[in-house]
Amino acid sequence: MSKIHVWVPDLFSTTGGIQTFSRHFLEALGKEVSPEGIRVLLKNDPPDAVHCDDGFRDVNAYGHWPTPLRTPRFASECLHRAWRERPRLIVSTHLNFGPVAQIVRDFTGVPYVLIAHGIDAWRLNSRSRQKALQKADLALAVSRYTRDWLVHKNGLDSQRVDVLPNTFSPDRFAIGPRSPRLLQKYGLTAQTPVILTVCRLAGAERYKGYDQMIRALPQILSEVPNTRYLLVGTGPDRSRIERLGAGLGVQDAVVFAGFVPDEELSEHYNLCDLSAMPSKAEGFGIVYLEALACGKPVLAGNKDGSRDALNDGELGLLVDPDDTTEIASEIIHVLRRQHPHPNLFHPEVLRQRVTELFGFETFKRNVADRLRPFLSVLVLSLAGVLT
């Protein structure tokens, strides 16, 4: 019985947008095809970190290999298993594995689908990866912004690129009161105006706009004193951010939460009056969906995939990410609860609408729709085996 092979960077050893997407993608695919019809190959997860409770049994992990050997080992295993098993389809949730998929297709005819997220697409500095992307049977982009980048910057045929928006787990996020424990931990009160950003603090992540938030704070504080900017996330850029805040005289208004485990994210979203990440190169932005599921107003940049996450402004505020005056002005109106946006201060409306647009049931239907030309053959094959 031919299966679908899904190649994934990792699912368990790190957290991030691609990991979250990959988990949801596998869950959706497993409900469409059944886990027995899928083989998963994980590059960076060690075998002892793998814990699949969704019926997946054919999972191969290579994260225990030394870093210098891991990439060639993973590539050789992908090639070997594809050659031996002749899958119906190969899906790679990262563009880096595209050249290997192209080799398989060239020698066996097995079709492949590549999924592009954001920074992986606009930092595609390898000719072999670009060629593999161009030759893919289908490229899926998580937003219109990423899709347009693939078409205009990487020369893809627009007929072979489609959009598969991100999703989230609504049951992990809920509208709730401010946690007294977290208020005490961060030196806040129930009345403190709080702006929240959730992201990794690293040089490569500055496009997410936390610098712009720091630069907007003097104007915000002049109108809404005692405001606190809560940064959730860790990374090597923290010391530079601290210096930036000190240079602007707003260091006391910036609160670093550090690493927060997934199970505590909902509580942190519920601390804030506004979740803000005015990015300018975000592929999509799952954090926007999470904040909206907690009923929180959201501010994002208007030049990237954030537009998709906020449904072109229906779900939140879209600002010029390079204009700190506009950023500050919009935030001030939200903190004063004077913004005219019709949905910002209606938590249940925000939660209901983001779930309708991006909840898992919608995502599952989207996966089935995008992969229908490939899945129909596999479903018929599985039906023949099971009868």
What are these regions (language model features)?
Residues 7, 189-208, 214-217:
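Conserved donor-binding/catalytic core segment of Leloir-type glycosyltransferases
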Residues 92-98:
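Short His-centered aromatic/hydrophobic patch
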Residues 145, 167:
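Carbohydrate-associated surface elements
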Residues 259-260, 267-272:
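Short alpha-helical donor nucleotide-sugar binding micro-motif in glycosyltransferases
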Residues 297-300:
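Short hydrophobic beta-strand element within catalytic cores of glycosyltransferases
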Residues 311-313, 317-324, 333-339:
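Conserved acidic donor-binding segment of nucleotide-sugar-dependent glycosyltransferases
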